[in-house]
Amino acid sequence: MPGAIDDHCPAQPGEEGTAFNVTMGYKYPPLCLGHATRCIHLETQVWAAYLLERLATGKWGHLVSGLSLCPLRQMKRGVIGDTPYFQYKPVGKLCPKNFEGPSKTLIWGDCVNSHAVVLKNDSYALVIDWAPKGYLKNTCSSGGGEFLEATYFISYWEDEDHHPTLHRWFGSFFTLKWEDKDITLHPQGLV
């Protein structure tokens, strides 16, 4: 996984599932989803989810590639017209309580957990990403094309069994900016 001073985002299909920093600038093109000037190609960075990692020292922000979680054909069907979004229903296997040692194969998986999305990377261990309340908003900073303003809300809900869950994924043609006065992104990097 990226170190504390990582400043790049996934730029090759083989890097899918790599967390990258959104606060320090970029080694590769800035994160843009869809077709826009200076963006990562659609075939490489199909969509992304903004998640919050819970640390004892404070709140940190990062993005996780969704390339391995969403088939490319699903995104291609929604490229023209309304901005597509994907929502995972709170069903599926429960998150494991005990974790095996690292393996030679990189495998990402998802599972249902209270107020969290869990991405399992068997090559490096398990990473648990806690999703914040708030929303993302399109910005015009990526330039090129017609700008369509849109807001993507991330919120919790309870299912019939009163288990709070969250699974929200989305795609956008433009750069996304996190907006929540209670969330502070630290520029020092990721751990």
Swiss-Prot record:
Origin: domain of life: Eukaryota
Tissue and organ distribution: Cerebellum and testis.
The keyword Oxidoreductase appears for this protein: no
Main location: virion
Compartments (UniProt record): Virion
Keyword entries, A-Z: Cleavage on pair of basic residues, ERV, Transposable element, Viral envelope protein, Virion
Location of the region described as Truncated surface protein in the Swiss-Prot/TrEMBL record: 1-191
InterPro entries per the UniProt record, alphabetical: HERV-K_env (IPR029104), Retroviral_env_glycoprotein (IPR051255)
Keyword Repeat: no
Free-text function comment from the UniProt entry: Retroviral envelope proteins mediate receptor recognition and membrane fusion during early infection. Endogenous envelope proteins may have kept, lost or modified their original function during evolution.
Similarity comment: Belongs to the beta type-B retroviral envelope protein family. HERV class-II K(HML-8) env subfamily.
Note: Intergenic, closest flanking genes being GSTM1 and GSTM5.
UniProt protein name: Putative endogenous retrovirus group K member 11-1 Env polyprotein
Organism encoding this protein: Homo sapiens
